[in-house]
Swiss-Prot record:
Organism the protein comes from: Danio rerio
Taxonomic lineage from the root: Eukaryota, Metazoa, Chordata, Craniata, Vertebrata
Protein name: Transmembrane protein 116
Bilayer-crossing regions: 29-49, 64-84, 103-123, 147-167, 210-230, 261-281, 295-315
Gene name in the database record: tmem116
GO cellular-component term (any): plasma membrane
The UniProt record lists the keyword Transmembrane: yes
Length: 361
């Protein structure tokens, strides 16, 4: 334990610390500003879905869970910025806050992937309903839809549990005595001293593990999103051509799908690209990010990563015409000349929801 403590105190120190106080101060204000905007963006989706009673709709629930995760993540970013004061000496608090942040952003990765998967399975169900009169393997799809949100929450907890336990056992939070202690993720020193020990320690292993699981979940998410959007595009062409006619409105929807194929992964990469570069360089060649390049990526990361809640609410929520019009699409007997039987309502609602999924993609 003492050996690890001695090595930790020599690692990740800045020189001279006071020269970079302005950099950390800039990052703090960027992080807090973008976190507040993300809170407003994610909160707007949550409030709209709750007040319009849309949370239980199968195409809205994934977006609601993603927005809820984005809201919690933005709150943690905001807390990190508020804790960035010279008088704050709770180093363990900052370390554990970073673990919470890592758990939340990995959960947001999985919820993003789950959202895109739900869009694809909805379109797939519509295709088989058109061919056979009923969706293919509806029971299995329904079970996967229930299991997806649970796994999206549990997997990040399981992946970050070793970081929490080992980090507190070996007191890795002594690294947070430096002025960047509570800011963002991957907050290694801007400059390393010549006395920094390259010796492999428990804390350095934990740091590399954190970066590895971040890179792994990032790649899984962006590759999965690209695959599902590509499959959705080809599936939509099959849905339309099965009717024997491919009109102008179908081409418009197909072009919309193609734009979404680019937009969804691009928005995700925009949020986490700088963090991806920082993590990769810190794993492969840490010397590269010392100095001005590290500062630039660090400031850029504060702008993009903390803006995820704002960007997601625009890309997946308010820019979607179908999402904005869902409040008026509920089944009401009073508005029909031929009232629906109570037993027919679930089937009608399911068909109406599936038929509108192409507008929601």
């Amino acid at each position: 334990m003492d050996i690890f403590g001695e090595n930790k105190t020599q690692m990740n120190t800045t020189t001279p610390t006071e020269n970079w106080t302005s950099v950390y101060s800039i990052v703090r204000w960027i992080q807090m500003t973008m976190a507040v905007l993300s809170i407003l963006g994610a909160g707007s989706i949550i409030l709209y879905a709750a007040f319009q009673r849309l949370v239980k709709k199968p195409e809205v629930l994934p977006l609601f869970l993603l927005s809820l995760t984005d809201l919690l993540l933005a709150l943690s970013w905001l807390c990190g910025g508020l804790l960035f004061t010279q008088s704050c000496n709770s180093y363990a608090t900052c370390y554990n806050l970073h673990i919470v942040e890592q758990t939340l952003y990995m959960a947001s990765f999985f919820y993003t992937l789950h959202y895109v998967w739900v869009l694809y399975t909805g379109l797939n169900g519509k295709y088989h309903r058109r061919l056979n009169g009923f969706p293919a393997e509806a029971a299995r799809t329904r079970n996967c839809r229930c299991l997806g949100p649970v796994l999206s929450c549990l997997l990040p907890l399981l992946l970050t549990a070793p970081v929490f336990v080992a980090g507190n056992v070996f007191q890795c939070y002594t690294n947070f005595t430096q002025p960047y202690r509570c800011l963002l993720m991957h907050t290694g020193a801007v400059y390393l001293t010549s006395s920094a020990s390259p010796e492999l320690t428990a804390c350095s292993i934990i740091q590399e593990y954190c970066m590895a699981i971040f890179l792994g979940t990032f790649l899984i998410t962006i590759v999965g999103m690209s695959i599902f959007m590509g499959k959705a595009r080809s599936l939509y062409k099959r849905v339309v051509t099965s009717q024997g006619f491919f009109g102008g409105s179908h081409w418009t929807t197909l072009r919309l799908l193609e734009r979404r194929m680019v937009l969804y992964p691009s928005a995700f990469f925009f949020c986490w690209g700088p963090a991806l570069l920082l993590a990769t360089m810190m794993l492969v060649k840490p010397d590269v990010i010392e100095g001005k390049m590290g500062v630039a990526l660090y400031i850029l990361q504060a702008f993009t990563s903390a803006s995820q809640g704002l960007l997601n609410c625009l890309v997946y929520g308010w820019t979607q015409k179908h999402f904005r019009s869902l409040s008026s699409s509920t089944v009401r007997d009073a508005n029909t000349q031929t009232p629906l039987l109570r037993s027919q309502k679930p089937n009608y609602a399911a068909l109406h929801s599936a038929a509108s999924l192409t507008n929601f993609v």
